[in-house]
């Protein structure tokens, strides 16, 4: 019984990474850009219907909802070879098309105005599923639509579908560069509050680290958006392989999430992928064994989140799930796990078992690959809190001077005061404190002392 997943793509960033994700899924399942199954794609071992459904004329349509407050990106998708893939009824563009002006408050209050139209689409998709498992939301936390409308949708999805899982792929801004969005720290913090309170699982895609990986590992001087988005779509498709090529374990979303998230608030995951290649660099083929792949996944340079070095806190893994694709002998996996434990290659929490799990998955039979084995690590690691700390520091700088707040004051939510900003700051601080507490043996009783 397939547990379907509906993908919601929001704003410029969400629609761009979503577009790459669907391109990747079509290639892996042998589906043409028009949604027709290719003649060679006859092996019936994959499960397409988690992410696609079939129209009356047999062609496959993504269970995707494309939302944006300005038309540019969605128009470029509709002018691409993949225009006929999507269900046109599932595309929502706001009528005035002015966007959210990189302003969280504008995105949020536009969400309030248009939520009926949006939920008509989402409810229709949900009703068309046999047993909907949940939603996947793609967005960035820095702009206006992805952050503001994204926050609004996260709150409403919890109200309307309290039993459904909500997983997000959230793109964090590049902190090495000056941002062209001056209110980015406000947008990020307001969105982080919703990601903490309203999502079950957040896969953090950190632009700082993605740019670093593209430069250092793939040797691209100035990585373009599309190259970074290709990295992201690799992670997104790899993290869903066990759903699409089901094995015995981890063949639904809750199985993936349950093994990684033992305590509900600490649900921000980082990812690592190896071996990384872009099209040109396939020449650099190394031997890939399971141990190689698993050891490389633990190296910080392959992890797609840039975490600051925090000497005071002894950061550690809460849980790891490695999704290994390719020709793998299961006994090798067991040996590799033993080696990792014996050599203490990973530092785990002091208050629970060293949870490192491995899910084996088939590779797509239709895509040539230069590597026998590739791996994706999804890890719950306490050092992700340093990403939130730097968001808070940037926010505090602006908030202290009350900089750029007049753009927010125009919207109802901030008309009288800025309590919502301060509340968000508190929620994120509590999240940081809990991640720090999770590095100590007494975390089990954490939260009971304070009440």
UniProtKB/Swiss-Prot annotation:
One of its GO terms (cellular component) is nucleus. Keywords: Cytoplasm, Cytoskeleton, GTP-binding, Microtubule, Nucleotide-binding, Phosphoprotein. InterPro entries: Gamma_tubulin, Tub_FtsZ_C, Tubulin, Tubulin/FtsZ-like_C, Tubulin/FtsZ_2-layer-sand-dom, Tubulin/FtsZ_GTPase_sf, Tubulin_C, Tubulin_CS. GTP binds at residues 142-148. It comes from the Eukaryota. Tubulin is the major constituent of microtubules, protein filaments consisting of alpha- and beta-tubulin heterodimers. Gamma-tubulin is a key component of the gamma-tubulin ring complex (gTuRC) which mediates microtubule nucleation. The gTuRC regulates the minus-end nucleation of alpha-beta tubulin heterodimers that grow into microtubule protafilaments, a critical step in centrosome duplication and spindle formation. Component of the gamma-tubulin ring complex (gTuRC) consisting of TUBGCP2, TUBGCP3, TUBGCP4, TUBGCP5 and TUBGCP6 and gamma-tubulin TUBG1 or TUBG2. TUBGCP2, TUBGCP3, TUBGCP4, TUBGCP5 and TUBGCP6 assemble in a 5:5:2:1:1 stoichiometry; each is associated with a gamma-tubulin, thereby arranging 14 gamma-tubulins in a helical manner. Gamma-tubulin at the first position is blocked by TUBGCP3 at the last position, allowing 13 protafilaments to grow into a microtubule. Interacts with alpha-beta tubulin heterodimers; the interaction allows microtubules to nucleate from the gTuRC. This is Tubulin gamma-2 chain. It comes from Bos taurus (Bovine). The gene is TUBG2.
């Amino acid at each position: 019984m397939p547990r379907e997943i509906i993908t919601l793509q929001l704003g410029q960033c969400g629609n761009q990474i979503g577009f790459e994700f669907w391109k990747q899924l079509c290639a892996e399942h042998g589906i043409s850009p028009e949604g027709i199954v290719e003649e060679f794609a006859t092996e019936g071992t994959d499960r397409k219907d988690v992410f696609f459904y079939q129209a009356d004329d047999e062609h496959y349509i993504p269970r995707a909802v494309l939302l944006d407050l300005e038309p540019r990106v969605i128009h470029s998708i509709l002018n691409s070879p993949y225009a006929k893939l999507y269900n046109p009824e599932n595309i929502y563009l706001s009528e005035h098309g002015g966007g959210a002006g990189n302003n969280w408050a504008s995105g949020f209050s536009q969400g309030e105005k248009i939520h009926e139209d949006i939920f008509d689409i989402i409810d229709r998709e949900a009703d068309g599923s046999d047993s909907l498992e949940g939603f996947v939301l793609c967005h960035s936390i820095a702009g206006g639509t992805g952050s503001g409308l994204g926050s609004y949708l996260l709150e409403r999805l919890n109200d309307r579908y309290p039993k459904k899982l909500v997983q997000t792929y959230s793109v964090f801004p590049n902190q090495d560069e000056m941002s062209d969005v001056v209110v980015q720290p406000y947008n990020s913090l307001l969105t982080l509050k919703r990601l903490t309170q309203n999502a079950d699982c957040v896969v953090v895609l950190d632009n700082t680290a993605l740019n670093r990986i593209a430069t250092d590992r793939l040797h691209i001087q100035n990585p373009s958006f599309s190259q970074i988005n290709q990295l992201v779509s690799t992670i997104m498709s790899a993290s869903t392989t066990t759903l699409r090529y089901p094995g015995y374990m981890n063949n639904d979303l809750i199985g993936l999430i349950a093994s990684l998230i033992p305590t509900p608030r600490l649900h921000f995951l980082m990812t690592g992928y190896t071996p990384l290649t872009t099209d040109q660099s396939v020449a650099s083929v190394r031997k890939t064994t399971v141990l190689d792949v698993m050891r490389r996944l633990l190296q910080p340079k392959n992890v797609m989140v840039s975490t600051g070095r925090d000497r005071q806190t002894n950061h550690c893994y809460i849980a790891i799930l490695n999704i290994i694709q390719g020709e793998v002998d299961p006994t090798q996996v067991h040996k590799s796990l033993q080696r990792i434990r014996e050599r203490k290659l990973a530092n785990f929490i002091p208050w629970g078992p060293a949870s490192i799990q491995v899910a084996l998955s088939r590779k797509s039979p239709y895509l040539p690959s230069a590597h026998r084995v590739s791996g994706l690590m999804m890890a719950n690691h306490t050092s992700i809190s340093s990403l939130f700390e730097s968001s808070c520091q940037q926010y505090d700088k602006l908030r202290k001077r009350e900089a750029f707040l007049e753009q927010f004051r125009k919207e109802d939510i901030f008309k009288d005061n800025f309590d919502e900003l301060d509340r968000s700051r508190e929620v994120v601080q509590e999240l940081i404190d809990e991640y720090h507490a999770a590095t100590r043996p007494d975390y089990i009783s954490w939260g009971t002392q304070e009440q």
